[in-house]
Amino acid sequence: MPAPQKDGPRANRDIRGVREVQLIDDTGQNRGVVPFFDALNLAEEVGLDLVEIAPNSVPPVCKLLDYGRFRFNEQKKQNEARKRQKTVEVKEIKLRPGIDKHDYDTKMKSVHRFFEEGDKVKVTLRFRGREMAHQDIGLRLLERVKSETAEIAKVESEPMLEGRQMIMILAPR
């Protein structure tokens, strides 16, 4: 059974099958192509680790540095990148065909706020009872929402009827 792979770059004696390496010292100076064991001895003399930076190049590029600090900084960078990553949520706004002007304006304020936050908006228009006979009213309402948000949003999914509700999905531009 092969040994488990370590995550991250190889260091010191973990670097195998290499006779010579392109060495970069702790000050960032390129020392050129050096025999592997000379580079390893130099790392031990200075009290640092020989870390393989570019394993696929010929010869591999190795650098003298503190491996523990290097791993810590890499982990810190990954955590920062994870924090900056924004998950896009889909917020839902529910409307009815007979919605009043003030209620409509309030819903539209919410829609604008969701777009400012970078979220997608699912506009759901629910029909009840005999309202199903007047789907054109619902379609006009969704077209009105689409035209009012045209500058700040794009339509990801056109209005379509699913059962007793008409759904449209908008995404911020």
Curated annotation (Swiss-Prot):
Keyword list, A-Z: Cytoplasm, Initiation factor, Protein biosynthesis
Stored Pfam families: IF3_C, IF3_N
Quaternary structure note: Monomer.
Gene3D superfamilies found in the cross-reference section: Translation initiation factor 3 (IF-3), C-terminal domain, Translation initiation factor 3 (IF-3), N-terminal domain
GO BP: ribosome disassembly
Native source organism of the sequence: Methylobacterium radiotolerans (strain ATCC 27329 / DSM 1819 / JCM 2831 / NBRC 15690 / NCIMB 10815 / 0-1)
An example Gene Ontology CC term for this record: cytosol
Family annotation (InterPro entries): T_IF-3_C_sf, T_IF-3_N_sf, Translation_initiation_fac_3, Translation_initiation_fac_3_C, Translation_initiation_fac_3_N
Family note: Belongs to the IF-3 family.
This protein's name: Translation initiation factor IF-3
Subcellular location: Cytoplasm
A single GO molecular function term of this UniProt record: ribosome binding
Origin: domain of life: Bacteria
Summary of the function given for this chain in its UniProt record: IF-3 binds to the 30S ribosomal subunit and shifts the equilibrium between 70S ribosomes and their 50S and 30S subunits in favor of the free subunits, thus enhancing the availability of 30S subunits on which protein synthesis initiation begins.
